[in-house]
Amino acid sequence: MSKIKNDKRETGHLKSPPETPLLNRVRFPSDLKQIPEEDLPQLAEELRAEMIDAVSQTGGHLGAGLGVVELTVALHYIFDTPHDRLIWDVGHQAYPHKILTGRRDRIRTLRQEDGLSGFTKRSESEYDPFGAAHSSTSISAGLGMAVARELSGGQRHVIAVIGDGALSAGMAYEAMNNAGALDARLIVILNDNDMSIAPPTGAMSTYLARLASGRAYRGIRDVGKKLTSHLGKSFDRAITRAVEHARGFVTGGTLFEEMGFFHIGPIDGHDLEALVPVLRNVRDNGTGPVLIHVVTQKGKGYPPAEAAADKYHGVAKFDVITGAQAKSPAGAPSYTKVFAQALVQEAREDKRIVAITAAMPSGTGLDLFEKEFPDRSFDVGIAEQHAVTFAAGLATEGYRPFAAIYSTFLQRAYDQVVHDVAIQNLPVRFAIDRAGFVGADGATHCGAFDVAYLATLPNMVVMAAADEAELKHMVRTAADHDEGPIAFRYPRGEGTGVPLPQRGEILKIGKGRIVREGSKIALLSLGTRLADCMIAAEELEAAGLSTTVADARFAKPLDADLIRRLAREHEVLVTVEEGSIGGFGAHVLHFLAHEGLLENGLKVRPLVMPDIFMDQAKPEKMYAKAGLDAAGIVKTVFAALGQAEQAARA
C-alpha cells in the first residue's frame, strides 16, 4: 500500500506525493511485465494513489480512471502494447494508462497548456493508437484495425475498452454487428461501472468466466466450425444453433452472442487474480470476436469518489485528504445556469415545453428542469441522433421541444438535423452549449462549427447570445418560435455580470442592434466577443478612430438593413465570431458581394477561429492566440487601414 508523508501543500493540509516503490520501477509496459504477478495488486494501489495525487493538482476526470486501475494493469501486463492495439473509448478513463506508458513525468500537466491531453491522442504517444473524447467509437476503430491486420497478415491483438454508458449509442452496435458478420478477431472489454447490465455472482461467476475463456469451452465453437467445413454451408445454420444451445446451458444466451461475439463474464474488474488469467486465456485461445464483461466501480479506492460518483466524474482541483474541491470566487452565474433557469421559467407558462438531453443533464443544466418537470424531461443517453429525431417527433404533435446539446456533440446528429428537422421545417429548439473555445478539454470539445453547419440549412434560424441577458431573450424567443427550427448558442463558463431581466423578451427574428455609435470603423459581433469589441472600440477611439459596435444576434437570417448601414457608413467593417471559417463572416461577405457593397472601397475583415484544431489552454489565452480578443481586433483594424506601425504595437 502506498503511504502518505506529511508536508504542506497549498490547501494547507499536511500531505506529499505518495510513496510508490513498485510503480517507480515501471516506465513502460515492458517494465510492468517484470513485476511478479503476485505484486500486481500493490502496484495497482500505488498507481491509484499516483493518479489521485496528480488529478488533485490539475483537475480532470477522476472517477472513471480510478475504476479501471486494475483493468489497466492487467491489460498492459498480458498484452504486448503498443504492438497490440489498446483503444480506450472516450479516453477520459485513460489517466492510469498514460502513467504506465511513459507519461508519468508529465501526468501533472494534464489538461494544461502544452501539457498532456485529458483524452487519448495519437500524436501524444504510440500507446494511443486511436484518439478519442467523444464516445462509442472504439469498437468501430478496433474493427478497422483488426481487418487491416488480416489484410496484411499480421499477428497483433486489438482490444477495445468501452463503458456501459457508451453502449447507449447506436454506433457501438453497428460496429458489433459488423464484427460478428466478419467474424474478425477483436477483443471488446465491456467496462460496466454502473452495474446496469448484470453484476457478478461471486466465485462461480469468476470460475465460469475463467473456464469460458479457456480452450475446453471455446472448443465448442471450434467444433461447430469444423463440422461446417466438412458438411458444407447448408448445415451451417443448424450447427450454429446447436453450438449456441450447448453454450447456453452454461451461461445462457446474450445479446452479444446473438451478434456473433463470444461472451465472457461478468467478472470483478478489481480482482487481478480473476482478470489476469481470463485475459491470458483470451489472448492465447480462439478466433473471432470476443466480449469480456467486466464490472467495476467508478471512483474505486477513493472514498469521496466512491460515495458520490457523479460529483467526482469531472473535478476541479481538490484536497486529497478531505476530498473538498476548490471553488471559484463567486461571480456571475454561468451561461448554462441562466439557460436552465430561463427554460424552467418558460415551462411554467407553457406545458408544451419539453427538454431533451443526451446523457448530459448536469452539463446542460437540464437537471434543474428535471427536478421541477420530471415528466417533461428526457435523458436519452449517449444518443444525439435519436435525441434530435425524438425531438422532431414531439414537434409534430404540437410540443415545443428544447434539445440541449453541446456544440461538439450536435455534430454527431447532423443528418438528423437536416433530414428529420430542417427539411420538414419542424420547430425543434436547439440549445447549443459550449460554443467557442472550451479550455481544458481542447480540440475535441471545441464548439467551432455549429454556425457554419446550421446557418447553411434552409428554414433554420441561428442566434448567438452576447451575454447572459441576451441568452434569456433567446430562450424566450425560441419558445415562441413555431415557424421552423431555431438554434441559439452560448459558451461555457460565467456570464459577464450584466443585470438579468425578470423574463426574457421575444426578439424580432433576423434583427440585430447597435450598442455603440461611431463613424469610421464598424465592429459587427456575433456572440460573446461583443465585450472585447467594446474594449477595442475604446482603444480605437483613443487613437482617433470613431467606432460603431453592433451585436448581430442572428447568423441566420442576417439583419440586411443593419449590414447595409454599416457597409455604407464606415470605411472598415470587421466581423467577429467564436466560430470557424464558413460561418457568420462568410454569410456577411456573401451578402455584401451580392449587394455590390464591396465595390466602393469598403475594407472587410472577417475574424474567425483559426483553421487548425487548437490544443487545450485557458479560453482567454486561446482567444488571444486566435486574434479574437480586443488586442487582436484593434490590430486587425490598423492593418486594414494600412497603419502597420500601430498594428504592430496593438
From Swiss-Prot:
Q: Does the keyword Metal-binding apply?
A: yes
Please list the cofactors this protein needs: Mg(2+); thiamine diphosphate
The record's section on CDD domains has: TPP_DXS, TPP_PYR_DXS_TK_like
Asked if Transferase is a keyword of the record, the answer is yes
GO MF terms held by the record: 1-deoxy-D-xylulose-5-phosphate synthase activity; magnesium ion binding; thiamine pyrophosphate binding
Q: Where does Mg(2+) bind?
A: D164, N193
* UniProt record, GO biological process: 1-deoxy-D-xylulose 5-phosphate biosynthetic process; glyceraldehyde-3-phosphate metabolic process; terpenoid biosynthetic process; thiamine biosynthetic process
**Keywords noted in UniProt:** Isoprene biosynthesis, Magnesium, Metal-binding, Thiamine biosynthesis, Thiamine pyrophosphate, Transferase
Q: How is the cofactor bound?
A: Binds 1 Mg(2+) ion per subunit. Binds 1 thiamine pyrophosphate per subunit.
Q: Which residues bind thiamine diphosphate?
A: H92, A133, H134, S135, G165, A166, N193, Y302, E384
Coiled-coil residue spans: none
Which reactions is this enzyme annotated as catalysing? D-glyceraldehyde 3-phosphate + pyruvate + H(+) = 1-deoxy-D-xylulose 5-phosphate + CO2
UniProt-listed Enzyme Commission number(s): 2.2.1.7
Region: Disordered; residue ranges are: 1-23
For bias type Basic and acidic residues, the affected ranges are 1-13
Cross-referenced InterPro entries, in alphabetical order? Dxylulose-5-P_synthase, THDP-binding, Transketo_C/PFOR_II, Transketolase-like_Pyr-bd, Transketolase_BS, Transketolase_C, Transketolase_CS
Record function comment: Catalyzes the acyloin condensation reaction between C atoms 2 and 3 of pyruvate and glyceraldehyde 3-phosphate to yield 1-deoxy-D-xylulose-5-phosphate (DXP).
Q: How does it assemble?
A: Homodimer.
The entry assigns this protein to a family as follows: Belongs to the transketolase family. DXPS subfamily.
Q: Which PANTHER family match?
A: 1-D-DEOXYXYLULOSE 5-PHOSPHATE SYNTHASE-RELATED (PTHR43322), 1-DEOXY-D-XYLULOSE-5-PHOSPHATE SYNTHASE, CHLOROPLASTIC (PTHR43322:SF5)
Can you say what this protein is called? 1-deoxy-D-xylulose-5-phosphate synthase
- What species is this protein from? Chelativorans sp. (strain BNC1)
